Amino acid sequence: MSKLQQFPLSKGWSFRDSEDTSEDAWMPVPVVPSVVHQDLQANSKLKDPYIGFNELEARWVNEKSWTYKTVFQKPAAPAGSCIVLAFDGLDTFAKVKLDGNVILENDNMFLARRVDVTKALEAEGDHVLEIDFDCAFLRAKELRKQDPKHNWASFNGDPSRLSVRKAQYHWGWDWGPVLMTAGIWRDVRLEVYSARVADLWTEVQLASDHQSAQVTAFAEVESVHSGSHRACFTLSLHGQEIAREEIGVTENGTAKATFDVKEPSLWWPHGYGDATLYEVSVSLRKEQEELHKVSKKFGIRTAEVVQRPDKHGKSFFFRVNGVDIFCGGSCWIPADNLLPSITAERYRKWIELMVHGRQVMIRVWGGGIYEDNSFYDACDELGVLVWQDFMFGCGNYPTWPNLLESIRKESVYNVRRLRHHPSIVIWVGNNEDYQVQEQAGLTYNYEDKDPESWLKTDFPARYIYEKLLPEVVQEFSPSTFYHPGSPWGDGKTTSDPTVGDMHQWNVWHGTQEKYQIFDTLGGRFNSEFGMEAFPHMSTIDYFVENEADKYPQSHVLDFHNKADGHERRIATYLVENLRTATDLETHIYLTQVVQAETMMFGYRGWRRQWGDERHCGGALLWQLNDCWPTISWAIVDYFLRPKPAFYAVARVLNPIAVGVRREHHDWSVTHAQPPKTSKFELWVASSRQQEVQGTVELRFLSVNTGLEVRERIVHENVSIVPNGTTNLIVDGLIDHRVHSEPHVLAARIWVDGQLVARDVDWPQPFKYLDLSDRGLEIKKISESEDEQTLLISTQKPVKCLVFEEREGVRISDSAMDIVPGDDQRVTIKGLKPGDAPLKYKFLGQ
């Protein structure tokens, strides 16, 4: 008997170009996990591919094969134990050799692999571990050539990527570079044990009244020799053991224990309650000796997707612990192209930003990776719901038998690895593969329910999404909802707004509609939509080295924007709405204003629709983050610097939010003639679970003078509908013949005497307004060691006051509209006495 021991193989590696067999070709690897681009940079063989045009200088790496090698000593292995070589992730085509003998061949980046090397390590002393990483870029092309009959329809990247189980964005996307990584991208170690807990998971049954829960813990045990093992299960809350049970392990290597929990503390998404985590542990014992112990945290909660017929079609929204949740949030792409560089701390900072921005759901997009455990741990601990795609994106995937088997193993492994996370509330089969099917005219008959027949069509990938994956989820995580694709809705056209989820790209892409009408373009759940914006100047300074290149249309800036047609799209939305500028800093700011306004118009309207029989169940913007310093749809850039849209979304997602808007007048199709009258509406959206009383004020303030142009409207003792929308004015009228000067509609709401939310509706477009000479005043009214409070006032309405984003500094609010008679406070944390004040900018400055 021996207690499980782990020996990390993170040091002592070297690598070389596989074709260069000379002894001096070997270069040191600083640490594993790593990928080849990191190791080449560490050896000064590659420049930072994120700077300038260096991505092009790194392209040679994409077509190379690489060999990694280390030498280790055989670990001490007591009698009756085994030695296992464990890889948590190999990227991607890897032939593993131990002392010259092939012990493993890998072709799937998303799989962990384990090899029993007990016999291979019988000899004492040094052993050589060598891994040949074949070129995935070239292998993919070979695989594609082998199946010329398959329709390789796809968006983004080389279509051959569909043949390889590797992160699809490595082939390049419309927001990221082409960097074909290879290497030991997750941990590698030796394990010595006589028996181990191979898996630990729970199944939770929560009573409908939430007063009790039944927690069943399961353990799967592997042992070298048969014998009587016992499993001691413990259940803990906040570090305190609350239950314990010891049970024998069955002959087939399983054990389970059931715990009854009275008055359980539930897991809630943030804003709805505490994200309480219980911990289950199992200690594997033999003759009272502990051989292995494993612990996992989980939550007691229910989660479902509610799909029911209604007046709008068929609903699609999330319900957690019986409470309907409007899921405002973002889509997530991998946070780096060089994946091992993402630390647990960096993951947590991203999720903390989600909470700071009042976003309740993050969608792990299907062209990236099944994320690191630390990502999901942060979501669990901070109360962020996870929409989890399987890793299929924008293509018609082949279904060769060996590929299907690899996909099955991949999906089983990752569903089992992640099933204990209470944050994961949905598994989704793919990203936009059904859109590829539609656009390529591939065969799809929803009424055909014979999976074997799907494999014979020109859209065989349907078998993956409607047969293979749902069976895996049902077997290994039966309480988690499965959705065949995103977007998808009952086999109907993916753009159908009455059912399922939809990706609404007719702002920016498609018909390039006005962002002011975004809310009219949505569906039952809007899981993608977006608008590009430049990152802050400090980020551009990182990747643009030459000062002469710092102008809006420079070659290097265009190179760092991978979206097709971005020039004309950015220009269109700028010219339609704003007074354009040629200096880079102002251009950056103007693109950010457009993005912030776009997100505000979408979220504000869709959240209002939540109150109309759950017409809109949620909105996940594209995208939260970047994988390199770039110009993209991200609302927070690669360096975790929020763009103005981040703050605009946070305000709309306030637990109680007031909204005001006048009807859209499309100036661009009416010869810019102003309307004679305009209708306006006023409402309150609330995610509170109880009715509250509030006072709502609406003022009409001149843009030119800051004075009120008509009598304000005040609604006192308003009963705010819980978890819904309270419409206060639906037929308001502005007569522009009487009130001819441009004016804003400024709304505020007080609850229990506290001002809780604001909204300001502006005349559109901004380019017709003179926004200079605002009389803005910003005063520092308090200061401590690392916190300042600013008081902001103005004589005339100010649009989109944006503060500088500085490393280590967090701002409570930015991208703000300031109106006379409504001073606002902003708290700045991380700015120390003596530090230079944050710069700021507003529209028209």
Swiss-Prot record:
UniProt xrefs under InterPro entries: Beta-gal/glucu_dom_sf (IPR036156), Beta-mannosidase-like_N2 (IPR054593), Beta-mannosidase_GH2 (IPR050887), Galactose-bd-like_sf (IPR008979), Glyco_hydro_2_Ig-like (IPR006102), Glycoside_hydrolase_SF (IPR017853), Ig-like_fold (IPR013783), Mannosidase_ig (IPR041447)
Stretches assigned to coiled coil: none
Protein name as catalogued: Beta-mannosidase B
EC numbers on record: 3.2.1.25
Pfam families the record matches: Glyco_hydro_2, Glyco_hydro_2_N2, Mannosidase_ig
Reactions listed under catalytic activity: Hydrolysis of terminal, non-reducing beta-D-mannose residues in beta-D-mannosides
Note: In contrast to clade A beta-mannosidases, which are likely secreted, clade B proteins appear to be intracellular.
Active site: E432 (proton donor)
